[in-house]
């Protein structure tokens, strides 16, 4: 059977080696005669798994010792609520930078919980014709006392990525659901990083939270216990039963990342994949990208057929040759190739080959 390359924005493809290992030990994990899905989350075997997973994640991201790592329920949207409830209190204010669909969704959730007056927003995307470009003002010139600044450095729907480290006078909260461990970052510049697992970490149902200890002293709003960071830290992410199979797969992905040379080597591979695809799009008059070069996402490459009447045929023919989930988000249309860490270069090369052939056959 020929290879199928899954370009879904999430849940996304997992590394082949991880999938094969999970398959091989699905019914008998660690010599226990049972699946990892069937054992107690408080068993010594599973505790050992979770401890090693945290060690590996800390090593991969160079997480300082004054940061806690939580493995939580809820995905990214769950963290939209958790951030507000854990940090804002009754009288605090927060600033949200808006650069696309997911940062907008975070704003909506924050305003629902805290009210309009506690949440300020700043749109940082400018339009130059059809091209989107990020423009971030000098944040230190804003005369406000915010509990935190929230932003999403990679917008999957819009294909926009912010590569610069923000210079913020307030603690930075970053939604890295779609670009965590895709490139090296300085964790110490952030107050909190959260990420839904289903793009670069594992299957859906799990979220990772990396939080600086001092932020846990901020006033809280009433909230559910399972989304309380303080309780999560106190109970080692096991105040309630965690999503154990997702945690297990995340642990295997961390091992795979280490065996691949770590985040630095994965970053080089990601840049090569994205560069291959963007270079082709820019050189072909049949397709176009609508994001400024300096803000083009390495993880989510959006592109448009100049004759959009061919969209359905493009998707149909791509699927027939093993290139699936290329349809763009319904809110923006076009196409989207999500090329997260697990996507091999061969998948991108096959996509470019198909796009070349499709363009040659369908030019007017």
UniProtKB/Swiss-Prot annotation:
Major enzyme class: transferase
Cofactor note text: Binds 1 pyridoxal phosphate per subunit.
Classification of source organism: Bacteria, Pseudomonadati, Pseudomonadota, Gammaproteobacteria, Alteromonadales
The name this protein goes by in its record: Phosphoserine aminotransferase
UniProt binding sites for pyridoxal 5'-phosphate: 76-77, 102, 156, 175, 198, 240-241
Broad class of where this protein is predominantly found: cytoplasm
Binding site for L-glutamate: 42
Protein purpose: Catalyzes the reversible conversion of 3-phosphohydroxypyruvate to phosphoserine and of 3-hydroxy-2-oxo-4-phosphonooxybutanoate to phosphohydroxythreonine.
Cross-referenced InterPro entries: Aminotrans_V_dom, Aminotrans_V_PyrdxlP_BS, Pser_aminoTfrase, PyrdxlP-dep_Trfase, PyrdxlP-dep_Trfase_major, PyrdxlP-dep_Trfase_small
GO MF entry, a single one: pyridoxal phosphate binding
Cofactors named for this entry: pyridoxal 5'-phosphate
Superkingdom in the source lineage: Bacteria
GO BP, one annotated term: pyridoxine biosynthetic process
Family listed: Belongs to the class-V pyridoxal-phosphate-dependent aminotransferase family. SerC subfamily.
Keywords per UniProt: Amino-acid biosynthesis, Aminotransferase, Cytoplasm, Pyridoxal phosphate, Pyridoxine biosynthesis, Serine biosynthesis, Transferase
Keyword Phosphoprotein: no
Residues bearing the modification N6-(pyridoxal phosphate)lysine: 199
UniProt pathway annotation: Amino-acid biosynthesis; L-serine biosynthesis; L-serine from 3-phospho-D-glycerate: step 2/3; Cofactor biosynthesis; pyridoxine 5'-phosphate biosynthesis; pyridoxine 5'-phosphate from D-erythrose 4-phosphate: step 3/5
UniProt EC number: 2.6.1.52
């Amino acid at each position: 059977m020929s290879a199928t390359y899954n370009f879904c924005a999430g849940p996304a493809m997992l590394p082949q080696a991880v999938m094969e290992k999970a398959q091989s030990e699905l019914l008998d994990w660690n010599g226990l005669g049972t699946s990892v899905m069937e054992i107690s989350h408080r068993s010594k075997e599973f505790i050992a798994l979770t401890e090693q997973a945290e060690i590996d994640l800390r090593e991969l991201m160079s997480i300082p010792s004054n940061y806690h790592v939580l493995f939580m329920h809820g995905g990214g949207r769950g963290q939209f609520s958790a951030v507000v409830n854990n940090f804002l209190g009754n009288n605090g204010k927060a600033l949200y930078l808006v650069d696309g669909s997911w940062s907008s969704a975070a704003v909506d959730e924050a305003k629902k919980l805290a009210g309009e007056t506690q949440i300020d927003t700043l749109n940082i995307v400018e339009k130059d014709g059809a091209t989107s470009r990020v423009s971030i003002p000098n944040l230190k010139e804003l005369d406000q006392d915010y509990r935190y600044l929230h932003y999403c450095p990679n917008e999957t729907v819009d294909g926009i990525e912010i590569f610069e480290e923000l210079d913020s006078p307030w603690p930075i909260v970053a939604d890295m659901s779609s670009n965590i461990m895709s490139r090296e970052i300085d964790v110490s510049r952030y107050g909190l990083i959260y990420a839904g697992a289903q793009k670069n970490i594992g299957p859906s149902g799990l979220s990772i939270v990396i939080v600086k200890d001092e932020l846990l002293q901020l006033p809280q709003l009433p909230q559910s216990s399972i989304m309380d960071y303080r309780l999560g830290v106190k109970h080692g992410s096991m105040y309630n039963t965690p999503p154990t199979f997702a945690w297990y797969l995340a642990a295997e992905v961390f091992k795979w990342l280490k065996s691949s040379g770590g985040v630095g080597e994965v970053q080089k591979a990601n840049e090569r994949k994205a560069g291959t695809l963007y270079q082709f799009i820019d050189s072909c008059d049949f397709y176009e990208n609508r994001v400024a070069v300096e803000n083009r996402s390495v993880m989510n490459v959006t592109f448009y057929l100049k004759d959009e009447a061919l969209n359905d045929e493009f998707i149909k023919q791509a699927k027939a040759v093993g290139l699936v989930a290329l349809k763009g988000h319904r809110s923006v249309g076009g196409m989207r190739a999500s090329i997260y860490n697990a996507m091999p270069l061969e998948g991108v090369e096959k996509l470019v080959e198909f796009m070349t052939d499709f363009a040659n056959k369908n030019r007017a």
